[in-house]
Amino acid sequence: MKKWIFALPVAATAAAIAANAPGFIVGGPQPGWTLAVTMGYLVCWAVFLRNGTVRWQRIISRIWWIASAVCSAACFCVVTFDLDGFLMIFPALGLVSPLLGIALCVNNHYPLFYGFCTLLAVWYAIGSRPSLKPDTTEEVN
């Protein structure tokens, strides 16, 4: 496995946080360019899950399922109770999971669209993982 693959999600997360920082200062994330950064960020996580070691794939998959529940609850709170400031905690949490990181982009007008994109990314990453069963085939020299 290539060592640089581990740097992809972290670099993508840093880019997403950096791109969103001005938006938070000015008054919330801007949908257009934020969407582009976040989609690239989710693709990096999907590549990592697809090419990482089996052990890391299991660990990250478990984190994703837990994070999806937390993110869903948070998005519900943000949209229902108009808690835009609550999103400020998500850049740091995005280092743990892209499903939490996607909340960088969620605002009152786009939650369903971003949620749909997140589900597509998760479906791709988990559905296209290599088999977790050990390879029993012998290589012929």
Question: What are these model-predicted stretches?
Answer:
Residues 99-123:
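Hydrophobic alpha-helical transmembrane segments
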Residues 24-33, 55-56, 81-86, 105-112:
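Membrane-helix interface and helix-disruption motif detector
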Residues 87-103:
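Short hydrophobic, aromatic-rich alpha-helical segments embedded in or entering the lipid bilayer
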Residues 61-83:
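Hydrophobic alpha-helical membrane-insertion segments
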Residues 1, 130-141:
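Short, charged juxtamembrane terminal tails flanking transmembrane helices
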Residues 1-42:
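Transmembrane alpha-helical insertion/packing segments
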Residues 36-65:
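Canonical alpha-helical transmembrane segments
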Residues 44-45, 114-134:
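Transmembrane alpha-helical segments in integral membrane proteins
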